[in-house]
């Protein structure tokens, strides 16, 4: 069922691309905005789920080691503090969305933030590392 759910976003993105191409060919510019919004939603749903699937592991659950552990300690003081802040971010998403841990390429540090719906509204310069699906179906 999870793969079918994810496939819906891929199909939605592909359909939106086809509708964009058709609207451009017909110079139907009023339809382009809706198709672009649908593309953003479905493509972000695909990307967010792709990252989320990679975050899951049957052997996971231990604290990170190496560079990630050092970056967490540097940004949050400890893994326990990071975990508490990430938990708070995930449980306070209003409506549908995601909790996210990302690398701020401008500030060179980790940040925790919320993503609403699927619009992939990551701050500019952020590389997403960890996503937690907080949609109702999750």
From Swiss-Prot:
Q: Does the keyword Metal-binding apply?
A: yes
UniProtKB keywords = Manganese, Metal-binding, Oxidoreductase
Enzyme nomenclature, EC number: 1.15.1.1
Cofactors required: Mn(2+)
Q: Which GO terms describe its molecular function?
A: metal ion binding; superoxide dismutase activity
What reactions does this protein catalyze? 2 superoxide + 2 H(+) = H2O2 + O2
> What binding details are noted for the cofactor?
Binds 1 Mn(2+) ion per subunit.
Does rRNA processing appear among the keywords?
no
Which of this chain's residues are annotated to bind Mn(2+)?
Answer: 2, 49, 133, 137
Known SUPFAM superfamilies for this protein? Fe,Mn superoxide dismutase (SOD), C-terminal domain (SSF54719), Fe,Mn superoxide dismutase (SOD), N-terminal domain (SSF46609)
Function of the molecule: Destroys superoxide anion radicals which are normally produced within the cells and which are toxic to biological systems.
In the record, the note on similarity to other proteins reads:
Belongs to the iron/manganese superoxide dismutase family.
Q: Under which name does UniProt file this protein?
A: Superoxide dismutase [Mn]
Name of the gene: sodA
